[in-house]
């Protein structure tokens, strides 16, 4: 809880830093000085630390599949003896997961689940055998679940490290879609340089059949596989499976097809029986973020819900008893950081100052709410595991991202990144000033917007206007944050058009996020 780790800029090391000072404490991993078989690796793409901190999974050779999914070649690094070996030699892996005791790793390869036992010379065994492309997927979501429920993993260990539980997706009845593949870049596909190829996969369009989903468990000692008896509509969803600290309970989330009725079950992996502990019903629809932002710590379930029209937090016990409403008001909780299991304090971010700003808060177990960030703009946080420190990431409409170290008590201890060089470079260009504004429609609805005027703007003159609009649900384009390049890929088209004499305007209309369900 007193330190954090980062990959070095050259991707060769993993370095540990002090949360208190921001200074380097130790080099935990150095690719050029590890022991073991000679391995040629370009660099570290990511890493996963075991619960006991003794083992680190080193992620390399990452290849994207869809928006969030990827395969990679993982290596097991033993921190104590500085030795690294491959997790598996049979092909790239997906979504590896450590067992709570740190002695095993489960992963997915080609739609099947595998298990590696570190105490048995990294012996690898196959857990499922029915996985097949475009038919059966074990432990990782299909395309539509990954895209719409914002997840790339559907597999957990039980708290005693004796069972693996996962969601199985049967997409055999889902209709196929084919899209052309071209040479492209990052990486280039030379086989499509002259003629395009085809990628055919299961793609459920609106109103069509989705995958049939079920939940399973595997007993590591007896090798017995069991189907969990989770109640589900014929066309229902299982958007998430989550571990708890009780080995006899795995949390399974279900949604009806209309997505206005969420149920959370506690399922026993041995008996296969499911007990309903929480239901949440809303007038409109339950956002996918409500499922993924639910936190389960100790005996607590922290549930985001729009049941009163705004996204707020509700604290339950594992048995489904509502302990307290954590937040309330005509604003939205935007990020959920977690619960301090020792105190019951809840850490989150919300736009309590208005839809364009975001601040970080802690809701104490005694009912008192304390604001942890104070600069206007967009604030987010990365907390230490003991909730004594946090990294504050801040920007506003005219200032790029700044990273600072802070204590939960309110003291800033270090500036990690100030981006002064970027701000100086940007100031050299003749750019228009970006400003926020608001107006009220003929229906009495206040809308927020931003505007970029040409440099040397003369209020007495008339200017042509370009309107940029997205308007997607849950999305906000109008924020008090640093953001240049509305079209992505580094194209600062809004400033270019301002240089050509246009006024560029964006307005968040009805249906966009941050302002409650009715809006």
Language-model regions, residue ranges each:
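Predominantly five- to eight-bladed beta-propeller fold
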Residues: 22-23, 61-66, 70-73, 127-155, ...
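N-terminal targeting or regulatory segments adjacent to alpha/beta-hydrolase or S9 domains
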Residues: 162, 167, 326, 337-423
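Serine-hydrolase catalytic core recognition
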Residues: 247, 378-519
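Beta-propeller domains
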Residues: 6-33
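Beta-propeller fold detector
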Residues: 24-32, 85-88, 123-132, 226-229, ...
């Amino acid at each position: 809880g007193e330190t954090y780790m980062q990959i070095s800029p050259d991707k060769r090391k993993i370095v540990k830093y002090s949360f208190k000072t921001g200074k380097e404490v130790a080099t935990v991993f150095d690719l050029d000085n590890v022991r073991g078989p000679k391995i040629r690796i370009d660099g570290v793409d990511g890493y996963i630390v075991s619960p006991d901190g003794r083992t680190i999974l080193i992620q390399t050779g990452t290849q994207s599949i869809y928006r969030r999914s990827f395969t990679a070649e993982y290596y097991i690094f033993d921190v104590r003896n500085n030795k690294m070996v491959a997790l598996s030699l049979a092909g790239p892996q997906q979504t590896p997961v450590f067992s709570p005791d740190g002695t095993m790793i489960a992963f997915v390869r080609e739609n099947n689940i595998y298990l590696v036992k570190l105490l048995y010379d990294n012996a690898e065994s196959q857990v499922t055998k029915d996985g097949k492309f475009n038919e059966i997927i074990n432990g990782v979501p299909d395309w539509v679940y990954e895209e719409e429920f914002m997840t790339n993993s559907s597999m957990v260990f039980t708290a005693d490290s004796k069972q693996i539980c996962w969601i199985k997706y049967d997409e055999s009845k889902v209709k196929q879609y084919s899209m052309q593949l071209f040479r492209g870049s990052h990486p280039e596909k030379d086989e499509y340089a002259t003629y395009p190829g085809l990628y055919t996969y299961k793609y459920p369009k609106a109103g069509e059949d989705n995958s049939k989903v079920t939940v399973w468990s595997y007993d590591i000692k007896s090798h017995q596989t069991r189907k969990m008896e989770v109640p589900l509509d014929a066309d229902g969803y299982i958007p998430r499976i989550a571990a708890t600290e009780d080995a006899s309970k795995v949390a399974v989330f279900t949604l009806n097809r209309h997505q206005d009725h969420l149920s959370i079950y506690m399922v026993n992996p041995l008996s296969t029986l499911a007990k309903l502990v929480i239901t949440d019903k809303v007038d409109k629809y339950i956002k996918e973020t409500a499922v993924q932002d639910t936190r389960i710590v100790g005996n607590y379930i922290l549930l985001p819900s729009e049941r009163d029209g705004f996204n707020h937090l509700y604290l339950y016990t594992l048995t489904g008893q509502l302990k307290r409403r954590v937040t309330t008001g005509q604003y939205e909780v935007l990020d959920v950081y977690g619960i301090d299991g020792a105190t019951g304090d809840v850490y989150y971010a919300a736009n309590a100052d208005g839809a364009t700003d975001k601040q970080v808060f802690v809701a104490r177990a005694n009912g008192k709410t304390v604001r942890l960030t104070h600069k206007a703009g967009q604030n987010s946080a990365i907390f230490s595991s003991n909730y004594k420190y946090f990294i504050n990431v801040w920007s506003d409409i005219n200032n790029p991202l700044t990273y600072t170290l802070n204590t939960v008590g309110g003291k800033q201890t270090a500036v990690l990144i100030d981006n002064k060089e970027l701000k100086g470079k940007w100031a050299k260009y003749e750019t228009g000033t970006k400003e926020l504004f608001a107006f009220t429609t003929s229906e009495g609805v206040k809308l927020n917007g931003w505007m970029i005027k040409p440099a040397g703007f003369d209020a007495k003159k008339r200017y042509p206007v370009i309107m940029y609009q997205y308007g997607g649900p849950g999305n906000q384009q109008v924020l008090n944050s640093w953001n240049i390049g509305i079209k992505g890929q580094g194209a600062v088209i809004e400033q270019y058009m301002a240089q050509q004499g246009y006024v560029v305007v964006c307005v968040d209309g009805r249906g966009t996020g941050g302002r409650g369900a009715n809006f």
